[in-house]
């Protein structure tokens, strides 16, 4: 089962209530926040409902490892370190990321890891309008494997 990275692009002004509730269920309360979700029909329906405020795509293990290492936070706003992951799970961050992508483990298996990654705005900008879909040259909606390039620019 693939994992999807979901990033909130647009703010909270004039958001309709059902979309606002969906974004809250996805834990995307602020712009440039990222969550990792499973590729299931229920999540895909939620993403489709909020498609005018978010972008998403399939994340790979290498990008997930960088995301955990650089932007992962533990309760108390402490960074996730190799030593912490080794102590709790007995593996490196890269091995953990690979197991998460393969579906053998979940991000919840790492104790005290916050479910939301707070990202920097993309270096070089969104390369298009924040109000148009990715297919139309904008930043919103499904972008497939290209989500990895966006996350790299936001780390």
Curated annotation (Swiss-Prot):
GO molecular function, a single term: structural constituent of ribosome
SUPFAM superfamilies: Ribosomal protein L30p/L7e
Signal peptide: none
GO cellular component, one term: cytosolic large ribosomal subunit
Gene3D superfamilies listed in its UniProt record: 1.10.15.30, Ribosomal protein L30, ferredoxin-like fold domain
UniProt xrefs under PROSITE patterns: RIBOSOMAL_L30 (PS00634)
Key words, A-Z: Ribonucleoprotein, Ribosomal protein
Keyword field contains Kinase: no
CDD domains: Ribosomal_L7_archeal_euk (cd01657)
A GO biological-process term: maturation of LSU-rRNA from tricistronic rRNA transcript (SSU-rRNA, 5.8S rRNA, LSU-rRNA)
InterPro entries, per the entry: Ribo_uL30_ferredoxin-like_sf, Ribosomal_uL30, Ribosomal_uL30_arc, Ribosomal_uL30_CS, Ribosomal_uL30_euk_arc, Ribosomal_uL30_ferredoxin-like
Assigned protein family: Belongs to the universal ribosomal protein uL30 family.
Quaternary data: Part of the 50S ribosomal subunit.
Protein name per Swiss-Prot or TrEMBL: Large ribosomal subunit protein uL30
Organism this protein belongs to: Pyrococcus abyssi (strain GE5 / Orsay)
């Amino acid at each position: 089962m693939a994992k999807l990275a979901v990033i909130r692009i647009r703010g909270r002004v004039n958001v309709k209530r059902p979309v606002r509730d969906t974004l809250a269920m996805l834990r995307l309360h602020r712009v440039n926040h990222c969550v990792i979700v499973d590729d299931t029909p229920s999540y895909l329906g939620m993403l489709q409902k909020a498609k005018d405020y978010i972008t998403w795509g399939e994340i790979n293990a290498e990008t997930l490892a960088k995301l955990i290492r650089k932007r992962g936070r533990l309760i108390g706003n402490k960074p996730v370190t190799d030593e912490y992951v080794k102590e709790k799970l007995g593996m490196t961050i890269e091995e953990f990321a690979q197991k998460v992508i393969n579906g053998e483990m979940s991000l919840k298996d790492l104790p005290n890891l916050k479910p939301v990654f707070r990202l920097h705005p993309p270096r070089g900008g969104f390369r298009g309008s924040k109000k148009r879909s990715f297919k139309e040259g904008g930043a919103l909606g499904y972008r497939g494997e290209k989500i990895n390039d966006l996350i790299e620019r936001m780390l």
